[in-house]
Amino acid sequence: MNGLENKYIIKNNKRLRYGYTTGSCAAGAASGAVRMLLSGRELSEVTLPTPKGITLTLALHDITRGDNYVSCAVRKDAGDDPDTTNGILVYVKAEKICCRDSETDNCEDIGTGASRPQIILDGGIGVGRVTKPGLSQKIGEAAINPVPRAMILKEAEEAALSLIHI
């Protein structure tokens, strides 16, 4: 059950099943990875709202833990849309990073003492890079469109805020 079981659109007199976007998959995986990283618990699914007001429940797959990271994936379901990304696993890796204190060489978690967690978003395998001006991101940044970028950052930040006291 993902929240879309009874959602359809009629197009050319055909009833087409709703699906969800790659951005929703990435946002769900980000939420799951951050929650598992900070809580130490295993999750099987996450719930998130879409920009259209639909609440999705997304299963988490291929969970991997390391010393300071958790990665997981959400499987894309494009519904009846002929999307070439249908069925792929969209991965996110959440990692604790630190800043070295120049005097003590101690590693301090980023976000300590800050009013909000500091979240750095970058693309991984399969995500292109901006190479020319004209997109909403700077040259060299991951080519993640504004709405999915905002969704990913929102879900990661909300997950972090729900589990840490800054």
Indicate residue ranges for each PLM-predicted region.
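Acidic-glycine-rich active-site phosphate/pyrophosphate-binding loop
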Residues: 1-9
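Alpha/propeptide regions of enzymes that mature by internal proteolysis
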Residues: 10-48, 116, 136-162
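Short, glycine/acidic-enriched capping/hinge loops at junctions between secondary-structure elements
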Residues: 40-41, 58-60, 84, 132-134
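Short, basic and Ser/Thr-rich N-terminal targeting/leader segments
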Residues: 42, 54, 86-88
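Translation machinery proteins
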Residues: 44-81
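A generic, well-ordered mixed alpha/beta core segment in the N-terminal half of proteins
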Residues: 68-99, 108-161
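Conserved small/polar residues in nucleotide/adenosyl-binding loops
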Residues: 164-166
